[in-house]
Amino acid sequence: MSILVKNNIHWVGQRDWEVRDFHGTEYKTLRGSSYNSYLIREEKNVLIDTVDHKFSREFVQNLRSEIDLADIDYIIINHAEEDHAGALTELMAQIPDTPIYCTANAIDSINGHHHHPEWNFKVVKTGDTLDIGDGKQLIFVETPMLHWPDSMMTYMTGDAVLFSNDAFGQHYCDEHLFNDEVDQTELFEQCQRYYANILTPFSRLVTPKITEILGFNLPVDMIATSHGVVWRDNPTQIVELYLKWAADYQEDRITIFYDTMSNNTRMMADAIAQGINEVDPNVAVKIFNVARSDKNEILTNVFRSKGVLVGTSTMNNVMMPKIAGLVEEMTGLRFRNKRASAFGSHGWSGGAVDRLSTRLQDAGFEMSLSLKAKWRPDLDALELCRQHGRDIARQWALAPLPETTQKTAPVEETTTCTAADLGPKMQCSVCQWIYDPALGEPLQDVAPGTPWSDVPDNFLCPECSLGKDVFDVLATEAK
């Protein structure tokens, strides 16, 4: 089924509600995606891009119901990746002599995927035009490394539509095609997620390329992307966001993520977050366990943040594998204008935190001091973590923070109070996780100093997600 975009332009793409992994398993498409292909019917009939290769047969069948394939005069391939040009082999088997307009780099990419050097390729470069009749032209603009060397955009005069390729798109599937028809919160979340995880490495190219396109002084009434919605309502809003995101973007936000074997590094993360909030209650702090979180959400939060704290247990003298993998991805994304600090617990020998700190520095982060704790952090160690958080809050503040005269209560007083007033520690009978009233459970809004009797009935064990009824008094404290 086609959808009218504007005048003689129709969407003939494919929705993919089920896809959950993109670029292998590197991008989680939690809201599906779409592969946008456009059919222009003027004096000349033009097809802009195809769809993902797994929908090749369906795409050609649907296209045949819209137009006699032999009547397609030109094919435009803005990008040779398989989710854009994947149906070319199926299509060209029907119309093998139809000219394909693309960049020189795209010929190499297309042949690399489809192995048909005999196809009728027509190389275009920035400023080249193609007359499609009725007083209208297609103008081509090369956009190398946004995000492949072969990438380009195509502008249609008369209708003032920019076919923008991957730029300004999002992996977002909806029955509606246009930006003003969908949930705006979801849409802009997916736009930022897409930019943070795919286009961030090329931020230095975004601003000059947008400036170059604006320099053509061409009106833009619509931006027709390769994935997600078509921008018809105030289409320049997404262009303005790209310019903002490309300019060393950061919010007053700190992201903390960690992996842990025995919950010790998690305790450190909670305490560090408490310290940050004590000194700067206005900064947004998000905590993620990488083993249980969507990594693309973590990376999007890193993109938004002024700084990141990364925690790892030590395993065989090195960091946890999921942490190592995520730091490697951050290295490839080449975040700019970000600060970082490493922390973690260890047993008889360390090594992971130092290695992690070096990796973060190699990834381009401005480093602050790291923090280590041996074994399970006691009250003294947790106070050091909170102090580390306070120090980080001051060092990373975007504006000077007021001095505080509040003094931290001596550890001995806290210990006495805990033993006398807060009741016993509780242990999950399933996974052995221990609830310490002195520490609380900040991720579930249970403040430090909360006795078990005051913990809400909807409390869930953070390790196994079972309720309060599976908890018993810790054996060493039972009377």
Curated annotation (Swiss-Prot):
Pathway: Nitrogen metabolism; nitric oxide reduction. Its main location: cytoplasm. Binds 3 Fe cations per monomer. Binds 1 FMN per monomer. Fe cation 2 binds at residues 83, 166, 227. Residues 254-393 form the Flavodoxin-like domain. SMART domains: Lactamase_B. It comes from the Bacteria. Keywords: Cytoplasm, Electron transport, Flavoprotein, FMN, Iron, Metal-binding, Oxidoreductase, Transport. It is found in: Cytoplasm. FMN binds at residues 260-264, 342-369. Its cofactor is Fe cation; FMN. InterPro entries: Anaer_NO_rdtase_flvorubredoxin, Flavodoxin/NO_synth, Flavoprotein-like_sf, Metallo-B-lactamas, ODP_dom, RibonucZ/Hydroxyglut_hydro, Rubredoxin-like_dom, Rubredoxin-O_OxRdtase. Fe cation 1 binds at residues 79, 81, 147, 166. CDD domains: flavodiiron_proteins_MBL-fold (cd07709), rubredoxin (cd00730). GO terms for molecular function: electron transfer activity; FMN binding; iron ion binding; nitric oxide reductase activity. Residues 30-210 are annotated as: Zinc metallo-hydrolase. One of its GO terms (cellular component) is cytoplasm. The keyword GTP-binding does not apply. SUPFAM superfamilies: Flavoproteins, Metallo-hydrolase/oxidoreductase, Rubredoxin-like. Fe cation 3 binds at residues 428, 431, 461, 464. Gene3D superfamilies: 2.20.28.10, 3.40.50.360, Ribonuclease Z/Hydroxyacylglutathione hydrolase-like (3.60.15.10). It holds the Pfam family Flavodoxin_1. Anaerobic nitric oxide reductase; uses NADH to detoxify nitric oxide (NO), protecting several 4Fe-4S NO-sensitive enzymes. Has at least 2 reductase partners, only one of which (NorW, flavorubredoxin reductase) has been identified. NO probably binds to the di-iron center; electrons enter from the NorW at rubredoxin and are transferred sequentially to the FMN center and the di-iron center. Also able to function as an aerobic oxygen reductase. In the N-terminal section; belongs to the zinc metallo-hydrolase group 3 family. Homotetramer. This is Anaerobic nitric oxide reductase flavorubredoxin. The lineage of its organism: Bacteria, Pseudomonadati, Pseudomonadota, Gammaproteobacteria, Enterobacterales.
